[in-house]
Amino acid sequence: MTQISGKARAAARLAAVQALYQADMEQTPLHLLLDEFHQHRLGAEIEDVEYAKADVAFFDDVVKGVDARRDEIDGLLSARLAKGWALPRLDRTMLQILRAGAYELMARRDVNVGTVITEYVDVAHAFFEEREAKFVNGLLDAVAKDVR
């Protein structure tokens, strides 16, 4: 059995969030979205920047899993939002980070809770300031308590 590097999974998580965002914004059918990422994004060089090789199977699992279990995931996230908050109020990128993290906490028991939370906090740092990254940390920690 081959050991998948942490870097490859980190790249897969970031790509999954990007793919989920694209699906949300453009309503791209899942099979076309996955094909686009497989052919043109994962590990590709874009604007002279070479992206890390991603764990393609892990990427596929997160994207397909969020798509298949969106209602369940959104219910978990909604239950943990502060009073007066609803998912549509969240930034769309933030929502995809939370969905991907929640899916991993629910379905990927092979990955420990701390790793999942840390990885999605790192993804949040790619798009947001520290305050929002802390929000990801707190919400995913609460979801983890519900599902693990």
UniProtKB/Swiss-Prot annotation:
Protein's GO biological process: DNA-templated transcription termination; transcription antitermination
Pfam families in alphabetical order: NusB (PF01029)
Claim: Translocase is one of the keywords in the record: no
Disulphide-bonded residues: none
UniProt protein name: Transcription antitermination protein NusB
Gene coding for it: nusB
HAMAP family xrefs: NusB (MF_00073)
GO cellular component, one term: cytosol
Organism the protein comes from: Novosphingobium aromaticivorans (strain ATCC 700278 / DSM 12444 / CCUG 56034 / CIP 105152 / NBRC 16084 / F199)
SUPFAM superfamilies: NusB-like (SSF48013)
InterPro entries for the chain: NusB-like_sf, NusB_fam, NusB_RsmB_TIM44
Role description: Involved in transcription antitermination. Required for transcription of ribosomal RNA (rRNA) genes. Binds specifically to the boxA antiterminator sequence of the ribosomal RNA (rrn) operons.
Family, per entry: Belongs to the NusB family.
